[in-house]
């Protein structure tokens, strides 16, 4: 997934509600307001003074001139904060058969109705193979070592998706929860039960039913975000308690 226009560097002033942020452009010193496409907690990714990357908006119908896309991390690493990006990245990867566990599927449909008033992110079908329901989750929390963690706050919706996928398995289909780590300084994934114990319980129940838990990293630069390598999932690993 490539960004539509070249990104510009800025310094974050503040993120003052779920969808708005202020930043100072590095090149001009102008303070601008930018759309923050992330309703989550964004732990460690919204500190004043952090170097961020904004995408200029050339659509006159939009109210804000910039959209916040990336946070620059230590040692040259990057984190993507746009929660719409994972579905785009995974959609491109599925179409290119780049996800090993799903490479046998030739037909991919997005936003297909299923379950109870839900839409699955992707439905993969192929003659002779079970229909596969794929949900995608954005991951960008890191608190210790090289562990990515999910979720970064309570997600009732996320637990519902796990239950819906479990029901698909019980109905004879295949179901996959795919966690996409949108930061380049993590090499493995674990749950964060201290932040949402209900989600951890839903994860265990879904996995016991047969829902497959996959995780992939990403390659991130100021040009875009693409699929990286498969990462191990270790839900039993102990997350740190109440650290920012």
From Swiss-Prot:
InterPro entries: SfsA, SfsA_C, SfsA_N. It comes from the Bacteria. Coiled coil: none annotated. It holds the Pfam family SfsA_N. One of its GO terms (molecular function) is DNA binding. Belongs to the SfsA family. HAMAP family: SfsA (MF_00095). This is Sugar fermentation stimulation protein homolog. It comes from Dinoroseobacter shibae (strain DSM 16493 / NCIMB 14021 / DFL 12). The gene is sfsA.
